[in-house]
Amino acid sequence: MAVVDFMEVIRRTETGPFIEERDFDIEVIFKTIRGLVEKYGIEYSRDKLITADPEMADAAFQAGLELAEEAGIFCVDTSRQIQFSREELLYGLKAAPRELRIGSGKDQRVLRASVYGQTCRPFIWAGFSGAPMTEQTFRQTIRSYIKEPLVDALGHGSLHVVDGIGVRTGSPLEVRATRQELMYVREALWREGRPGMPYVAAESSTTALGDLATMHPDFMPAGNFHFVPTLNELKVDYQRLTKTMAAYEYGIYNINLVDAIIGGYAGGPEGAAVVTIAAFILGLIVHRASVSLCHPAHNKWVSTSPPESIWAENLVGQAFARNSPIITIGDVWTSAGTGTKDILNEITAITITKSLTGNHPHGVGATNGKFSHGSGLDARCMAEVAHAVYNRGLSLEEGNEIVCELVGRYEDKFSDPDIGKPYHEVYDVESALPREWWLEIYRDFKGEMRREFGLQL
């Protein structure tokens, strides 16, 4: 047996069962997920944000697999369900890559799937993820992430203004913006002496225009990555399928970006976890995904630092690590901004969870990408926390205790987070190095983590 051919996926966008989108949302997504959560006894606990219950992780995986089989994925352009048999879904899981050798020269790295019970060196994917920036801010900030020695791969947001003109969806500027983005990425990698570092890019275009415009060795050499989002919940359109086909045939890796909404049609954190598992399974076939990215988005706060988001991602990671390991990464998105202690607490709580439950950290998306208040020191914290967890051999129970404590220090601030400072106030722009006052805050934080929790950052 082989993985379902992509042309067969396209065929099923035309021949699958017809259903109105509203009916898919309510009858298929909402009602099915609610029933599966009850059937499998999946239950959120604020006191167990990192669950040590393997049976719940296994139950969540089975619920997600059942949802993937029953719902399939809805094609917005044709109002058809693209459905797959249980056998097709399981073979897609079996055929998924367990490791990728990416980058070149001294910057080559191996990105591996996490297997339950086995230690796996963390893979650090860093940059000001999700942030729309001006050209000047993009070029200034990107160097601060590349300079960090623990960073393995780059993912650095998008340009929303080019030559002083705003980039509109579907406009010719999506082509120009995405090419400019790639030019700045490659320029910065050469400047900082890491030309072979792998990266995810082409983020400056919401349609397929930008991706198509950069699939050339001068912009996006084969072997790098771009995002192909699964639309909420379990949906796809021709734009996403175009991205998939072009990248698959050209030779860059697709990352299936899934941002299930906690408080949306999937329900609470339990349903968000189940629909994310289903989306990951379906994305292996529909998006030809080599990597799957988890971002359970809180419907009010967006970031991945609320306790409900942390719990959902913990369950997704453990479900795959135990039942069918695939390469998964997870967004480190904070409500607070750079230059604050709050962002360090959020980064640490999210990163501990990811490191213990099978999701390599990707970030930091400071201020949820609303403001250009991010810096390379945010990524340093993320990387050093991940390596501290790995080096110490932290248990799930120990990690849960730390994470629950840290979440308690910031969870009452989501309605009015400290957005911190813009990049030029926390970093010297010319040297791309952190200012002393920001370094001092981080040094104090590291000492606090060592004294309170025994984490050697």
Question: Which stretches of residues belong to each language-model region?
Answer:
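Helix-rich catalytic cores of soluble enzyme domains
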Residues: 124-356, 360, 369-372, 380-387
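Secondary-structure junction/capping motif
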Residues: 55, 62-63, 67-69, 267-269, ...
